[in-house]
């Protein structure tokens, strides 16, 4: 039962993250001015990563008996979410107004971390699916 709930939480986060990262964010930048789209994304990302911290944290607790690989991926996933929420996103926010060139570099790093978060989440989902 605990693993099914962990699977549901991780699947929800994976779907949410994929939808936002690969559809919503790019669409915002296509239909809105860059500044407007950036303002929207700037408000959404802390909620997205905060929710990820909660869901991944709960799933890590619920799936603690799912093996070392699940735990390792879960801990790394949680650390990357914390990094995004409390270090990278605030740094990006500050750089956007002061050093746009450096902002773009950090933005690339942030995108890579987000992709890693989604891939780690997918890995944990697959572990739980195939563990059955």
Swiss-Prot record:
User: Which superkingdom, per the lineage?
Assistant: Bacteria
Protein name as it appears in the record = Uncharacterized protein aq_125
Q: Which GO terms describe its cellular component?
A: plasma membrane
Where are its TM segments located?
7-29, 44-62, 69-88, 108-130
Indicate yes or no for the key word Transmembrane helix. Answer: yes
Question: Which organism encodes this protein?
Answer: Aquifex aeolicus (strain VF5)
Q: How does it sit in the membrane?
A: Multi-pass membrane protein
Record's subcellular location: Cell membrane
Q: Has UniProt tagged this entry with the keyword DNA repair?
A: no
